[in-house]
């Protein structure tokens, strides 16, 4: 059993609002089309299903630090990044303020792949081989760094 040392859940408000409005509008037009016509609006149904899938995949960002892994996952957990605690180089941990135009979601930036639900504060930690990084949006960077240090110290003893 893995011991959870830190857990943060960030709701992705923007994607939830956009998807909810889109799904509601498309459902309204689907029902209207079915009442007024005998044809089935397959395109609207497909678009509605697409927004439902997007909503399920991206409705939240969860950051979990266990005794063995640092994990950042979106939605139900199909899109995630998982790095072993021992691979992270805590000395490279730094807060990064990203520009608003980098956007939100999974972003490929000059700093690395960012898992982001809002603009503002982010935490960037490189791995010891400098080939990968743990780059997430958070306002609790110091708590994550503390949890990572504790997990690394516990695994080294």
Can you annotate each of these PLM segments?
Residues 1, 33, 73, 78-79, ...:
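Soluble, non-transmembrane catalytic domains of enzymes that act on hydrophobic metabolites at membranes
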Residues 1-37, 114-117, 130-131, 139-143, ...:
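N-terminal membrane-targeting/pre-transmembrane regions
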Residues 3, 62, 122:
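A residue-level signal for beta-strand positions that form part of recognition/binding surfaces
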Residues 36-47:
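Hydrophobic alpha-helical transmembrane segments
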Residues 45-46, 53, 127:
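Short hydrophobic/aromatic segments of transmembrane alpha-helices and their interfaces
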């Amino acid at each position: 059993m893995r011991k959870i040392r830190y857990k943060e859940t960030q709701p992705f408000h923007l994607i939830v609002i956009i998807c909810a409005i889109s799904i509601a509008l498309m459902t309204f037009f689907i029902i209207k089309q079915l009442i007024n016509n005998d044809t089935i609006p397959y395109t609207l149904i497909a678009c509605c299903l697409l927004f439902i899938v997007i909503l399920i995949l991206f409705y939240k960002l969860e950051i979990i630090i266990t005794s063995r892994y640092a994990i950042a996952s979106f939605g139900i957990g199909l899109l995630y990044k998982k790095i072993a605690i021992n691979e992270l180089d805590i000395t490279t941990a730094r807060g990064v303020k990203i520009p608003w135009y980098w956007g939100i979601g999974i972003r490929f930036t000059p700093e690395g792949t960012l898992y982001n639900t809002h603009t503002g504060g982010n935490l960037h930690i490189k791995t010891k081989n400098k080939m990968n990084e743990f780059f997430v949006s958070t306002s609790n960077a110091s708590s994550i760094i503390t949890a990572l240090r504790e997990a690394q110290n516990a695994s080294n003893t």
